[in-house]
């Protein structure tokens, strides 16, 4: 079974060809360099860039494979920036009509959940997933491949969004995640005393409080260095994530745990996460950010279930 996966939910244009759970090829174009000067993604510009990028990616695709060999076309339908999603949908629809191939809608977060399973890594169920990105922070309990339940989520800002906002305020650059992660890795000093927020839901998150404490310390000059502020933010944010996820592990007793989403590329988070369970599944770094392979993989597992 050959599946084309299409991902355009935010600022990455990506397509991938997957055969029986294995990636044959993937092509991605990032818009990060475009948005560095703005400190974040501008939806209208992102949509226009997707239109240009999809045309380029289509050429790569046609050079790689006879399109008639594709069995199914999967695309990200939600959540995401509406204009960006529309570009992917129109591209997928045009191919579907031209090739007479069925379309498969895929939820972007489902794709991140299964990103660690790309290239036939086995997920044992029930499973518990931690999905962390610029737009989402969720704990997902999966009884099986498609019986999902969100058991915890952020009540305000997503963790990736906070990384970007903190980094922007400290004039460190965009995107904030890799920059702050690198600073944290080399920092040897004392951390600021920051309070971990409490939430009414046992497994829910609240990152705006952490962000506000960090920005207040910066604005009031209650810090020794910019590195101290950045490292302190990561130290408390990642450990807060891990502590909440530990509670969920104790409650649901999963057979495996998964990490997904753009923030899953964070080295400190991966280091902490791997010690939580005997069966931990990470995406490869190239599959941590938004990509077409995870969309194709999700579709493959769905089709495999139905076959």
Curated annotation (Swiss-Prot):
InterPro entries associated with the record: ATPase_NBD (IPR043129), Gcp-like_dom (IPR000905), KAE1/TsaD (IPR017861), TsaD (IPR022450)
EC number of the protein: 2.3.1.234
Gene Ontology cellular-component annotations: cytoplasm
Transmembrane among keywords: no
Chain sites annotated for binding Fe cation: 108, 112, 290
The entry's keywords: Acyltransferase, Cytoplasm, Iron, Metal-binding, Transferase, tRNA processing
Record-linked Pfam families: TsaD (PF00814)
Function text: Required for the formation of a threonylcarbamoyl group on adenosine at position 37 (t(6)A37) in tRNAs that read codons beginning with adenine. Is involved in the transfer of the threonylcarbamoyl moiety of threonylcarbamoyl-AMP (TC-AMP) to the N6 group of A37, together with TsaE and TsaB. TsaD likely plays a direct catalytic role in this reaction.
Protein name: tRNA N6-adenosine threonylcarbamoyltransferase
